Amino acid sequence: MSSFLNFNMNKEMKSYLLGFLFSSLLTTLPFLLAIEKFFCSEVNYIIFLLCAISQIIIHFVYFLHLSFDPEERWNLITLLFVIIIIFIVVFGSIWIMFNLNHNTM
């Protein structure tokens, strides 16, 4: 029983370390590109966006342990629901502020 727990712990620790290494690399890369100015600003924006999206995916996979297994379908449905609610709140607030600005002018 204890060897099973040690194997599972090592697998989990390896997952956390890989996630930490990937996320720290994807954090330092945009800082390096912004400081050193290797590319023009448009290319930097695209690289920043790709790093941010890939870092979100890495956090979901390595730290939240989301997968596409049939047993974990509810986790993905919950994540989709949270993303929809955040989208409604953020863009609804922007829409309301735009209309308030338009009505006061």
Swiss-Prot record:
A single cellular component GO annotation: cytochrome o ubiquinol oxidase complex
InterPro entries: Cyt_c_oxidase_su4_prok, Cyt_o_ubiqinol_oxidase_su4, Cytochrome_c_oxidase_bac_sub4
Subcellular location: Cell membrane
Cytoplasmic side: 1-14, 67-75
Bilayer disposition of the protein: Multi-pass membrane protein
Stretches in topological domain Extracellular: 36-45, 97-105
Known function: Cytochrome bo(3) ubiquinol terminal oxidase is the component of the aerobic respiratory chain of E.coli that predominates when cells are grown at high aeration. Has proton pump activity across the membrane in addition to electron transfer, pumping 2 protons/electron.
Name used for this protein in its record: Cytochrome bo(3) ubiquinol oxidase subunit 4
The organism of origin for this protein: Buchnera aphidicola subsp. Acyrthosiphon pisum (strain APS) (Acyrthosiphon pisum symbiotic bacterium)
Chain's gene name: cyoD
